[in-house]
């Protein structure tokens, strides 16, 4: 899809845009709920705040970091990954190294190359575009980049595998009566782990990412019941429509041209 977006003539032809975090407007929209969460706290509890953010493509947590740069006094951020833990390994070791994607029960975090991390690097490297280009080109060529002095800028990280996710969903449900989806469970994991408590003072705010009804099998396995949502229940009675498209830029563009012309 990045190749498709880079074809500016095609993008202009069909009015192509994106609603995922490739589009900076998405990141800016996500800034809002960090500010909202901050002001929902009592005034005397707004110091030493750490946001715990389930993270795959680094977009959500980047929004929070930008809010911090805007002046909201957020202490830091914990990047909560699943078993696809390239960002956890980065913040632990300073090494950004590609591995095979391991499919998980938290599929939106099944990412090895976090595209929004480039945006963070740009600021971390004092807006040195040439340095960012060198880092990204080295990573693309070798699958690895070693940061000599990575400024973690208040970031820490954690990793949660599939077995732990199911356990955390159950623990959160029993303790709080809240049904967490698999991605949100990765955010709860470090908060519920007593060994992490010595690292934090103040408040930890866990960001939820999806409705648990999207993951019925995982939720049922963890707590013995399904979570439902009316908008998803309505879809069950509708006919399934699906298309198969070759995973090439030209095939995707041809598919888009055909279907955009029908709108």
Predicted regions and their residues:
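PLP-dependent amino-acid enzyme catalytic core
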Residues: 1-263
């Amino acid at each position: 899809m990045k190749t498709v977006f880079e074809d500016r003539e095609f993008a202009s032809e069909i009015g192509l845009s994106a609603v995922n975090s490739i589009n900076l407007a998405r990141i800016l929209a996500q800034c809002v709920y960090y500010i909202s969460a901050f002001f929902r706290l009592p005034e005397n509890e707004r110091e030493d705040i750490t946001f715990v953010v389930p993270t795959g493509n680094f977009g959500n947590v980047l929004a929070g970091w930008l809010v911090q740069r805007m002046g909201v006094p957020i202490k830091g951020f914990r990047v909560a990954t699943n078993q696809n833990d390239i960002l956890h390994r980065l913040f632990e070791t300073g090494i950004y190294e590609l591995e095979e994607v391991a499919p998980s029960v938290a599929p939106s975090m099944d990412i090895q190359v976090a595209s929004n991390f480039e945006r963070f690097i740009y600021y971390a490297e004092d807006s040195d575009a040439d340095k960012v280009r060198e880092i990204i080109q080295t990573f693309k060529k070798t699958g690895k980049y070693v940061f000599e002095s990575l400024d973690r800028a208040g970031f820490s990280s954690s990793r949660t595998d599939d077995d732990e996710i199911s356990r955390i969903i159950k623990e959160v449900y029993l303790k709080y009566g809240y049904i967490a989806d698999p991605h949100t469970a990765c955010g709860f994991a470090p908060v519920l782990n007593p060994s992490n408590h010595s690292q934090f003072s103040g408040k930890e705010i866990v960001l939820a990412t999806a409705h648990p009804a999207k993951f019925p099998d995982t939720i049922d396995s963890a707590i013995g019941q399904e979570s439902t949502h009316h908008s998803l229940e309505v879809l069950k009675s509708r006919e399934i429509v699906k298309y198969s498209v070759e995973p090439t830029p030209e095939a995707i563009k041809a598919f888009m041209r055909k279907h955009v012309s029908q709108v």
